Regions:
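Small cysteine-rich, disulfide-bonded extracellular modules of the LU/uPAR three-finger superfamily
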Residues: 1-97, 104-149
């Protein structure tokens, strides 16, 4: 088992302080989600997207993953948060253990594919010639996929 948990990448935290990421819906950067098999090994130290151990293209899933639709950041009390619309890869045969969300627009790390978060699905998730859907948690201060308290 290579995935060991969900992480907000340390490089992402630094890049936030450098104004490298823009999550605004209409004028923000392009964020993607790439799916990986259980051989992938990601931690909070992951800095860039990689094709190594990414699942094979199938149906509407292609190399590099799918483009996410940003939800403009907001706050509640002392927590700022943002989210993405759910994404579905149709007619896909996929077995994925986890994912990377990364920014295709920045140049803050070692390239233009700076990672934001590592997602561990907890076990392999599969679809066979069907829909592979990623449902993001509720966009609030306690549950949003990206939160800063």
């Amino acid at each position: 088992m290579a995935f060991t948990g969900n992480f907000m990448c340390t490089s992402f935290k630094v890049e936030l302080m450098q104004a490298q990421h823009n999550f605004t819906n209409s004028t923000g950067h392009t964020f993607k989600i790439a799916l990986y098999d259980n051989n992938a090994s990601f931690t909070a130290a992951t800095t860039d997207y990689t094709a190594t151990n990414e699942v094979s293209a199938s149906g509407s899933y292609s190399a590099g993953g799918g483009t996410l639709t940003n939800v403009t950041p907001t706050s509640s009390s002392t927590t700022a948060f943002t989210d993405f619309d759910d994404i579905t890869f149709t007619s896909a045969t996929i077995t994925a253990r986890g994912a990377l969300i990364y920014n295709t627009t920045t140049g803050g790390g070692s390239g233009t594919t700076d990672t934001v978060v590592v997602l561990d699905f907890g076990s392999d998730k599969t679809s066979t010639s069907g829909d592979f859907q990623i449902v993001f948690p509720t966009a609030d201060a306690s549950n949003a996929i990206i939160r800063i308290a």
